[in-house]
């Protein structure tokens, strides 16, 4: 499979948000706005790219018995670095995403890709898998955030599109996340078939 096919696969065929239904905790909780969704997606993508590459490089020296703990330590190291960078340079994003940045450590997308792809493929292919799955996750979260922000606040990326009288508060609350995700998954399934 070519590197472009690996990226396309992560965005379309194995989209973590709409096809694999992985990472639902940050998907539902952080997508109250397009900016939050995009920020969480980019944060997860950066960790995914780095961990896929490193885990693929370490696969030949990692004993099977300690494989999962090694994966978690590598993931935790990159998440810690990411959290420090976000706290230092992007305090607004840090305030908006809060606890969900450290929770990237236990995000099943990252551990799943480490186990399913990075541990079995070359470092370069694993890097491209991280890019593809990360882009798929980022696009999914951003789309979900855009829908929720437009319907709930009448704006997108902070720019007002609709007057306040058309806002539906439900969509910026947790039930709105489930409803929006359900409709988007249904649309994706319809388009696939």
Question: Where are the regions that the model predicts?
Answer:
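Structural signature of hydrophobic alpha-helical transmembrane segments
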Residues: 34-50, 70, 94-105, 175
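C-terminal ends of transmembrane helices
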Residues: 51-64, 111-121, 187-191
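Transmembrane alpha-helix boundary signature
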Residues: 81-96
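N-terminal membrane topogenic signal
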Residues: 7-18
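A glycine-rich, hydrophobic loop/mini-helix early in the fold
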Residues: 48-49, 53-85
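C-terminal transmembrane helix-loop-helix hairpin of multi-pass membrane proteins
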Residues: 4-5, 125-193
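Hydrophobic core segments of alpha-helical transmembrane domains in multi-pass membrane transport
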Residues: 22-28, 44-49, 76-83, 105-111, ...
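Cytoplasmic-side transmembrane-helix entry/capping segments in multi-pass membrane proteins
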Residues: 62-75, 96-102, 126-129
């Amino acid at each position: 499979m070519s590197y472009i096919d690996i990226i396309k696969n992560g965005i379309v065929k194995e989209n973590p948000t709409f096809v694999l239904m992985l990472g639902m905790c940050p998907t539902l909780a952080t997508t109250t706005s397009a900016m939050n969704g995009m920020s969480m997606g980019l944060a997860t993508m950066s960790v995914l790219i780095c961990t896929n590459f490193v885990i693929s490089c370490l696969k030949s020296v990692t004993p099977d018995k300690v494989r999962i703990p090694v994966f978690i330590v590598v993931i935790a190291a990159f998440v810690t670095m990411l959290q420090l960078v976000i706290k230092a340079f992007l305090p607004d994003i840090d305030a908006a995403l809060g606890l969900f940045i450290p929770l990237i450590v236990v995000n099943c997308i990252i551990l799943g890709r480490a186990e399913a792809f990075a541990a079995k493929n070359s470092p370069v292919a694993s890097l491209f898998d991280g890019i593809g799955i990360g882009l798929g996750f980022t696009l999914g979260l951003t789309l979900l955030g855009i829908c929720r922000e437009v319907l709930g606040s009448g704006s997108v990326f902070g720019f007002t599109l609709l007057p306040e009288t058309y806002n539906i508060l439900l969509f910026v609350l947790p039930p709105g996340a489930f409803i929006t995700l359900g409709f988007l998954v249904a649309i994706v399934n319809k388009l696939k078939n």
